[in-house]
């Protein structure tokens, strides 16, 4: 009896693992890590809260547009420029703020402390593009402390100063604020937009049409037809 060739099954198994990993990574990159495919099918593009629900909202500013984003969100990264242009069109008295998703157990929430700490340090916007690139292009896990500390050092951010800021009252308050908003509005995908406490919008059209839609909600309390 001839010897069996064990190489072929091993090769097929290795190929299967590689292909499976590639598919899983693509799904994580292009689908929000906070929502399963089934959940995404159930999400509505626009939800209006009742007056009672809006009044109980943890959002501090009633005349505001808030984006709930995540560093690991591909669509958040590519739309930064569009959001800057939209923010420049906001009328006087209206504010725009970006907050990181913060939900227990959500994979994309693992960098909420990084966002909050750098924000309190006053340097978050300066490093945001680099963080997007590190996570989405270089696949660096900045949610792991040791890896994050190495990245901080590489980018000339004082690790001791970061650690001190991360335990400050200001950082904890910001984390609590983000967690309350993420939970209250049941944010299940990023980016999610909260308008004047009462509207929750997901992107349902391309920019700049989506900017017009958000600005209409901010200024006129009126959604635009697609």
Predicted regions and their residues:
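Extracytoplasmic thiol/disulfide redox context detector
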Residues: 2-106, 179, 220-226
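Tryptophan-centered motif/residue detector
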Residues: 70, 86-87, 138, 151, ...
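Alpha-helix capping and helix-coil boundary motifs
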Residues: 5, 33-39, 139-144, 205-210
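Structural microenvironment flanking redox-active thiols in thiol-disulfide oxidoreductases
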Residues: 90-120, 124-153
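C-terminal cap of thioredoxin/glutaredoxin-like
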Residues: 2-24, 154-226
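Extracytoplasmic/secreted proteins, especially bacterial periplasmic and envelope-associated proteins
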Residues: 78, 82-85, 109-113, 126, ...
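Solvent-exposed, acidic/flexible segments
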Residues: 62, 72-79, 104-111, 120, ...
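Residue-level detector of secondary-structure transition/capping positions
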Residues: 81-84, 91, 122, 135, ...
């Amino acid at each position: 009896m001839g010897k069996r060739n064990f190489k072929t099954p091993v090769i097929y198994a290795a190929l299967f693992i590689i292909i499976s990993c590639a598919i899983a990574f693509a799904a994580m990159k292009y689908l929000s890590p906070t929502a399963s495919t089934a959940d995404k099918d159930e999400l509505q593009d626009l939800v209006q809260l009742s007056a009672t629900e809006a009044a109980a909202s943890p959002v501090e500013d009633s005349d505001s547009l808030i984006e709930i984003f995540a560093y690991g969100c591909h669509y958040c990264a590519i739309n930064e420029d569009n959001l800057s242009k939209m923010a420049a069109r906001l009328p006087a008295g209206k504010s725009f703020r970006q907050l990181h998703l913060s939900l227990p157990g959500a994979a994309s929430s693992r960098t909420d402390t990084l966002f909050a700490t750098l924000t309190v340090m006053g340097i978050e916007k300066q490093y945001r593009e680099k963080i997007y690139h590190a996570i989405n292009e270089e696949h660096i896990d900045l949610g792991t402390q040791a890896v994050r500390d190495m990245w901080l050092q590489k980018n000339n951010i004082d690790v001791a100063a970061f650690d001190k800021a991360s335990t400050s009252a200001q950082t904890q308050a910001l984390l609590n604020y983000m967690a309350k908003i993420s939970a209250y509005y049941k944010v299940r995908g990023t980016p999610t937009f909260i308008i004047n406490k009462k509207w929750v919008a997901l992107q349902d059209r391309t920019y700049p049409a989506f900017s017009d839609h958000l600005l209409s909600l901010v200024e006129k309390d009126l959604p635009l037809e697609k």
